[in-house]
Each structure stands twice: as structure tokens, then as C-alpha cells.
Regions:
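Cell-envelope and extracellular/periplasmic
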Residues: 75-80, 141-144, 156, 163, ...
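Loop/turn elements at helix/coil->beta-strand transitions in domains of secreted/extracellular proteins
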Residues: 68-72, 98-103, 147-150, 171-176, ...
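Primarily recognizes the serine-hydrolase "nucleophile elbow" in alpha/beta-hydrolase
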Residues: 142-143, 149-196
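Extracellular/lumenal mature domains of secreted and surface-exposed proteins
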Residues: 254-345
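Serine-hydrolase catalytic machinery in alpha/beta-hydrolase-like enzymes
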Residues: 49-57, 68-146
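The feature captures the conserved acid-bearing segment of alpha/beta-hydrolase catalytic domains
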Residues: 176, 181-254
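A domain-start/cap signature at the N-terminus of enzymes
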Residues: 21-71, 129, 154, 158-161, ...
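Bacterial N-terminal signal peptides
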Residues: 12-23
Length: 345
């Protein structure tokens, strides 16, 4: 039986299945699978994450195959009434079908160009959105086959605020952040948060004829990220105006997923009394090098020691918190970064 026999298009299923009318607002929830367990594809509307109750919308490619691992795009809508979560999802349908992406569009409270972001504390809507987004991703990953090395958070216009904030606070989830003609302020993250996320990929672009203020905010992002050591940060003006440009974001994202090495640090221990011996191994998955060969590996062990070996055993003699920073350069010259911390008591 072909894939189309196994997986039912969302629109056809809604005609054949019983839909749920939500008491609050009467919105129609699309079942994400049929009664006999088949995955529904296409537009999946008004899902509600179990623990937070947050609404989100999905697009599942019509040729979805659970034997594959799919890149996941988490996208934040622009300022209401110019955009909303379902409409933001709809903007991604063509890219999702063309490139094989699963798209998740939560209903963000903080996706507004008018959001006030204090210097001394996170804005409450950002914190609420962060909690909901993490829970939604957990739910989505439990239902679908997701590439853990291929999760992007992106925002258009006012959606830049939650995209940057949530991405920076969760580098353990997201491979990259993309701001699409999006808002930014340096108040979104502390220097400590930036330090823990500086290995990430970040891309911001704005229109050459963009709305007032967006070029300046993206140049502010350029300064902020660059000064905090984000080595894989890119800024690029694009022709046109305030264009959400999903295709540009998708191409950037998929270039990373399909051609850059994904790396992890395997540490024998991350905490203990001094002197603390630790064995560190660089784990590399490179789509362009199935045999695992890379050009070079470089460790900064956090105490003014370096190593170029894929596996290194090092003893930390003094108490302290050590930031271990790893760079892997692949055979095509791409430099990927990862980091961890060793706490010596």
C-alpha cells in the first residue's frame, strides 16, 4: 500500500469524520489521526496542548512517512490584526509541501510589535509563550517523526519577539532562530542566557524597503548577537518590503539540516569534586559525510587548555564552573559549535 493509502489528507478526513466543536468559540478541531490510528495530513487546526491548553495549528506534508524524520518549523505570527496563528501556518503550506517540512504555529500572546519588553525582567507574555511552546513541541514530537537536529523557531514581524526569546532560552531544543523582517530588542535575553546559546545558528533578514524601524532593529540584533560571540549569525537585506518570505527561511534552515554537521558532546561526568577527570567525546552526524570524516575538531576545555582530538580526557584540578566549547569543521568548511559545562566542587 502506498503512503497515500496509509495517510489521509486533512480536508478529506474532516468531511468523513466527526469534528469536535469547542465550547469556547465554536472552533473546529481537526483530529490528528483517524479512529484506526492513521496519521492525518494537510492542515490540522485548533490543537490544544494538554498541560497548558494552548491552541496551535499544524501542517503535515501530504506524503508524510513515519519512517522518515522531518524538520520542524515552529513559527510565530505577526501583530494582530495583520496576522494570526492559523494564517501564519497557511503561509508555510507551499514551503512545507515543497521541502517536506512539518509546520507548527502556536497562538502566541507575545507576537506583537507593540509588546513592552522591560530591561530588568522578562515580559509575562513571553514567559507564558515559552512554557506553552516547549510543551507543544513535546506533544508534536510524541505524535510525529521529527528530526531532533532539525528544529527551527522563526517569527515574522511582531513574532520576532517570541522567536528570539524562546530560541535563546532553549538552545537544547532549537538548531536555529530566524527573524523574518522581525522585531528585536536587546532586552529579550541576559548575557548569561546568550552565553549558553552562542553555539546556535541565527539568521535575520529585512526588506530593503521595509516598514520604518525594522532595518534598525535587525541591525541592533546584528550588534547584539555578534558582540556575544554567536559565530553562526547572519544578517541579510532582501529585495522588497515587509515580506514574511517563508521560502528564504526554509532554504536557510534546510541548508543547515542537510549540509552542516550536527554535533553533540558526550561527557563522562559533568559534576564532581576536585580533582575531577572528565572524558569528552565529539559525536558528529554529517549528512554529507556518512563515514563521519571531518576536517578538524577543536576543544576549548574552559581552563585555558585546548585539544584537537575527537576524544580527550582532562583533569580539572580546581573548583569552578568550566565552559567547554567545541568546534567541528566539516570537509566543506562548515563550522558547527556545541558547548557544555563542567562543575567542579
Amino acid at each position: 500500500m502506498g503512503n497515500r493509502g496509509k495517510y489521509v489528507a486533512g480536508g478529506a478526513l474532516v468531511l468523513a469524520a466527526t469534528v469536535l466543536l469547542l465550547a469556547a468559540g465554536g472552533c473546529v478541531t481537526t483530529p490528528w489521526r483517524t479512529a484506526d490510528g492513521r496519521i492525518v495530513t494537510g492542515k490540522i487546526d485548533f490543537q490544544h496542548e494538554e498541560t497548558t491548553g494552548r491552541t496551535y495549528h499544524l501542517y503535515i506534508p501530504t506524503n508524510y512517512n513515519p519512517k522518515r524524520r522531518y524538520p520542524l518549523v515552529v513559527t510565530a505570527q505577526g501583530t494582530f490584526p495583520f496576522d494570526e496563528a492559523a494564517g501564519q501556518r497557511n503561509r508555510w503550506v507551499d514551503a512545507a509541501e515543497r521541502y517536506g517540512l512539518i509546520v507548527c504555529s502556536p497562538d502566541f500572546d507575545s507576537a506583537s510589535g507593540f509588546l513592552s519588553v522591560p530591561k530588568d525582567r522578562p515580559a509575562p507574555p513571553l514567559v507564558h509563550d515559552e512554557k506553552a511552546t516547549v510543551a507543544i513541541i513535546k506533544e508534536v514530537r510524541s505524535r510525529y517523526s521529527i528530526n531532533p537536529d532539525g528544529i527551527m523557531i522563526t517569527g515574522w514581524s511582531g513574532g520576532g519577539f517570541p522567536a528570539h526569546f524562546i530560541g535563546l532560552h532553549h538552545p537544547e531544543i532549537f538548531r536555529c532562530i530566524v527573524g523574518r523582517t522581525a522585531n528585536f530588542t536587546e532586552n529579550l535575553a541576559s548575557d548569561d542566557v546568550a552565553l549558553r546559546a552562542r553555539h546556535m545558528h541565527v539568521y535575520v533578514f529585512f526588506g530593503e524597503s521595509d516598514l520604518p524601524g525594522f532595518a534598525a532593529q535587525n541591525r541592533e540584533a546584528n550588534f547584539w548577537y555578534t558582540m556575544r560571540g554567536f559565530r553562526n549569525f547572519v544578517i541579510q537585506p532582501q529585495p522588497g518590503g515587509h515580506d514574511p518570505n517563508q521560502i528564504e527561511a526554509a532554504r536557510y534552515f534546510l541548508n543547515i539540516v542537510n549540509h552542516w554537521p550536527a554535533i553533540q558532546i558526550d561527557a563522562s561526568t559533568t559534576e564532581g569534586p576536585a580533582p575531577l577527570p572528565v572524558t569528552l567525546r565529539a559525536l558528529v552526524r554529517d549528512p554529507d559525510s556518512p563515514d563521519g570524516r571531518v576536517d578538524s575538531v577543536l576543544w576549548n576545555l574552559g581552563d585555558n587548555r585546548i585539544s584537537s582530538s575527537p576524544e580527550v580526557t582532562h583533569t580539572y584540578e580546581q573548583p569552578g564552573l568550566y565552559n567547554v566549547f567545541l568546534m567541528v569543521k566539516d570537509l566543506d568548511g562548515h563550522q558547527e559549535f556545541k558547548q557544555t559545562w563542567i562543575k567542579v566542587n
